[in-house]
Amino acid sequence: MGKIIGIDLGTTNSCVAIMDGTTARVLENAEGDRTTPSIIAYTQDGETLVGQPAKRQAVTNPQNTLFAIKRLIGRRFQDEEVQRDVSIMPYKIVAADNGDAWLDVKGTKTAPPQISAEVLKKMKKTAEDYLGEPVTEAVITVPAYFNDAQRQATKDAGRIAGLEVKRIINEPTAAALAYGLDKEVGNRTIAVYDLGGGTFDISIIEIDEVDGEKTFEVLATNGDTHLGGEDFDTRLINYLVDEFKKDQGIDLRNDPLAMQRLKEAAEKAKIELSSAQQTDVNLPYITADATGPKHMNIKVTRAKLESLVEDLVNRSIEPLKVALQDAGLSVSDINDVILVGGQTRMPMVQKKVAEFFGKEPRKDVNPDEAVAIGAAVQGGVLTGDVKDVLLLDVTPLSLGIETMGGVMTALISKNTTIPTKHSQVFSTAEDNQSAVTIHVLQGERKRASDNKSLGQFNLDGINPAPRGMPQIEVTFDIDADGILHVSAKDKNSGKEQKITIKASSGLNEEEIQKMVREAEANAESDRKFEELVQTRNQGDHLLHSTRKQVEEAGDKLPADDKTAIESALTALESSLKGEDKADIEAKMQALAQASQKLMEIAQQQHAQQQAGSADAQASNAKDDDVVDAEFEEVKDKK
């Protein structure tokens, strides 16, 4: 059985880890970094860039450089959070035919899972380069507060990238695995506060150790899937834009190029202010008007940044209270607080969390890598490489159906340990009703329309009977990935209808298969491109070495041969500028044929050089046999 890799598919950065024996190892990507920016760029010449190369060219290609795609995955275009992003993102967010939020990439509507798949492909390639073997299976993490549609869309992204997603696990749970696996922790209750690039989660987790076996049980989870470092950046960007407008009278919001430079500078300033008290945002030639170029130079203090984002940090505190309440615990019951996600490096975040829990968060967990490590550990559990670990996760939101009067009736309450199964019997609302519609919902509100609709299906063929008589058993079954399967059965007729909940939107099987095929076709074209580059390099090398040999042969090379070689060199040189690998190989072959005489001369010259150096060594050796001696003239005594 091959390795199951662990992938933290983050909003801002992604990370991949594997189990190396009994320890998890975070892998470096091709650029030598342990994390990869979750940025994808589509260049003018049709190339797809992922990670650092995509980030580097963002300033010159803002409309086709996509970031923070995780905020759109599994969401509807009309969602309030999506509409907020529509107005601030440099790229184009559009409505798909089914109402989902998709992206317009160079005039083509593209689904978020398809774009996230590019990041997953890079993670897959990083692992394959390290292991030296194909990788086909992965554990991928998601925010604990992701709903069913978002989890399903993440699995779809994995499939498009050529990965069988063996398990979807929650990010805070993964971080707890990373924290608790190699520590003699005994029985402890920990709080994992996870503030990443685009999402926020809090999970209360109990680690029990009995006879060396550790059980990680999630007691409660809460969060906000649209709160993260990107929002902190946006606050700082808006402040800088407003200051510049006050000073220069120019609104940079209308200039995508300037906004992209500003985004980079704001992110850098935010990071610097975690260790410094103030920083300069210095952007020469940010824009120009009739009077000439304009430069931005604005001082930002840590206190200013904190005042801009204080309400965002406070927004993360409310879910902490709810999670503790749901777990039936008080602050004093928490033994350790673990911070995960890059945004938790901000001193203000650390201070607020410490104030809430009444204790300093632990500093021995890497906030950027813990989640990927935990995913790799879960991969190890699934392959049997990691033993004595049991993970009990929960469903983050209540699941139920719409019943008479537009009410949501929950079948499975939030924070129920998964996998789980629950059945309940319902009946008809009208006399002689022959069909019922099962409308599946996720959320905590009483009114059905205030919750997230996960889909609906019909159960037909109910025998005519007075209202309230037929018995329809509805069963909810949540698997270990947190994905829901629903069935409805008429107990009288035995008729049954089952569905796996795919978001009423989401990607259908046909679309996923099409995207998988496109990804495979891209992989094939990538392979062909790589082979073309290798052939070009060989051709370049042959050009260079042949020219050098012609020069060294001088007059020894007959004029006819020289002309034939020159003509073959010119033909190869022109072929190297094209895209035809077979033609380059043919021209290389033709040059080799024309150069036969040249090869003979080169071999003779080489043999002569060898002989010459052998003679020189031999004469040196003869000289070495001569012993230098001093003679003293002895005169006979007379």
Swiss-Prot record:
PROSITE patterns: HSP70_1, HSP70_2, HSP70_3. The modification Phosphothreonine is found at residue 199. Induction: By stress conditions e.g. heat shock. Residues 599-638 are annotated as: Disordered. Acts as a chaperone. PANTHER family: HEAT SHOCK PROTEIN 70KDA (PTHR19375). Belongs to the heat shock protein 70 family. This is Chaperone protein DnaK.
